[in-house]
Amino acid sequence: MELRAIGRIGLAFLISCCSFLTSLAQVGEHREDFAVGFNGGYIMSSLEFVPEVPQKLHTGLTGGLTFRFTSEKYFKSVCAIVGEINYAKIGWKEDIQTPDDKPVINAVTGLPEEYERDLTYIQIPVFARMGWGRERKGVQVFVQAGPQMGILLSESTKMNFPWDQRTMSYTDGSGRTSGVMAQDTMAVEHKFDYGIAAGLGIEFSFPKVGHFMLEGRYYYGLGNIYGNSKRDFFARSNFTNIAVKLTYLFDIKRTRNPKIK
């Protein structure tokens, strides 16, 4: 089912992009610019579990390759398609507290209990991008949005207490606030992730040097890392994350038009 959903999202997006660019070609100023480069940044993620698991933001790094094809300028909007192939470390970090909002102290270690799951993905977003401002020299503001797919490469756990000696959630109100702990021993069941991403950023362009971009990006996962049928423990287990990224692009091909600024 996941692969079918991925296919539907990708096909719908490609059809929309082709229709969009075709319509622009009839009324817009033609461009045929192609740029490549690399990106890197900081990513903050969590998982929307149902039933709920109290969490803090999981933090990690992301980086990879970026490709951009600029096709048109429609009135004042510069239109492009952007693709990336990224390596990203995401996951979840549990907020283990008592009902009084105090850290849960493990009886064996004497330390506040901590649990974190690191998940390493290859992420492939494809964006429709619109920018306003200078293309060759100066500043441009842009927005972009589109589907994103992810492929799980590996997972690892960070835990500072013996699992069989963990603090439970007791009926008298002591121990953990949440008794939901099934996820701590469950490996990821669905290796493919998919969803929708959108970003807002600013670009600085310099002739013969390239393009530098700063972007804030939000991602909402439409898939679940665990099964969500009636017999499964979780009804939902999808990603949300926020990334702050820097990107550098250099031009491979540029449209010959002295009017382009």
Question: Residue ranges of each PLM-predicted region?
Answer:
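Predominantly the C-terminal beta-signal and adjacent terminal strand-loop region
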Residues: 193, 201-261
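Acidic/histidine-enriched, beta-strand-rich ligand/metal-binding domains
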Residues: 79, 88-92, 119-120, 130-142, ...
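Bacterial Sec-dependent N-terminal signal peptides
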Residues: 1-31, 39, 246-250
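Transmembrane beta-barrel architecture of outer-membrane proteins
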Residues: 58-64, 78-80, 119-125, 140-142, ...
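Short loop/turn motifs that connect adjacent beta-strands in outer-membrane beta-barrel proteins
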Residues: 26-33, 72-79, 133-140, 206-211, ...
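Residues on the lipid-exposed face of transmembrane beta-strands in outer-membrane beta-barrel proteins
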Residues: 38-42, 63-71, 87, 124-132, ...
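Short glycine/proline- and aromatic-enriched beta-strand/turn motifs that initiate or cap beta-hairpins
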Residues: 25-68, 189, 261
